[in-house]
Amino acid sequence: MVMFKKLLILLIPFFSLGQNYYAYVASESEDTVSLIKFDGKEAVEAERIDVGFMFAEIEGPHGITVDPSGDFWYISLAHGNPFGTLVKYSTETNQAVARTTLGLFPASMEISAITGFLYCVNFNLHGSMKPSNVSVVDPETMTEITKITTGSMPHGSRLSPDGLFQYSVAMMSGELFEIDALDLKVSRVLNLEKKMMSDKKMDGKMMNHDNMKGKMMSKDKKENMMKSMGDMKHSMVKPTWVIPHPKESIAYVAGNGSDEVIEVNLDKWEVSDRFKTGKGPYNLEITPNGKLLIGTIKSEGKTAIWNLENKEELAIIKNTTSVSHGIAISSDSKYAFISVEGIGGEPGIVDVIDLDSYELVSSVKVGKQAGGIAFWKKEI
């Protein structure tokens, strides 16, 4: 028995050396997706896959996700005439197997392990400032089942750990949306702004403004102006991402405009905490063990790591190039894969961060404007 234990201790390093981690990353300005392989020491681009179907223009692969089985990955092509596309690929061959049309500028997405449906936000980057929607797709048939209206510029589609609720934020209207993944309806909406003027106060200010001009405004005209001002609302928070905690009834939101992380108590459906970040937090992810929160600080080209037990910032790591974007975390909570866009004609970069030492341990070049990123598997 003693000899067996000694042998096992000797073999552990060899088992560790045999571990490979795989992630997919989309390069939005090059219409490619790269398969990244990391052996614990060095990250390499194992394969570069051409995506998109229009030869004359860039289609902008933006959001990417791997299904719970690991057999397929999905990419949203944001640009279209005018609508974007969802494309399904086999992880075995990295060949496209099906596609379907979504809404205006489809972006981030995820699949529920319970319903099996894919939920993709339609960001509507170039459209008018009005509520957009979430496309619900059956990945088996690649059929869009419905579109669910949410807020202006929805982003950051993530499912609750039980797969029963989908969460997204509306960047320009400053709201958090909860969708019942079974009923396919919005169940709750939370305003993320610190302060908000009531319609009554806004109405009073408009009336005072009218009186100063010595004019009377008709009720219809005033209502139309109020509606127009509501449509033009610009959030101070500008939320860009939401991630539910894997073990607790809490979600964290990236306040890209307010330079903060917003903690939301999902039971009470209220903001329970806010803590400051660097300039322009963009994406957030939580390690599967629930201990660490990882955030890209887009405007500074950095990645931050927080201890979720006490909200302490454990590290702020400078990324290899500028414009930090997406995050994918290994299933064993050991590594974070960070996509970094770069600027101009620079290649995108995937940085690998060790979540034990909080150090950047490897980097690999990919296509221009590396953005959406998804962890695929750990292989022994």
Question: What are these language model-derived features?
Answer:
Residues F4-F15:
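Sec-dependent N-terminal signal peptides
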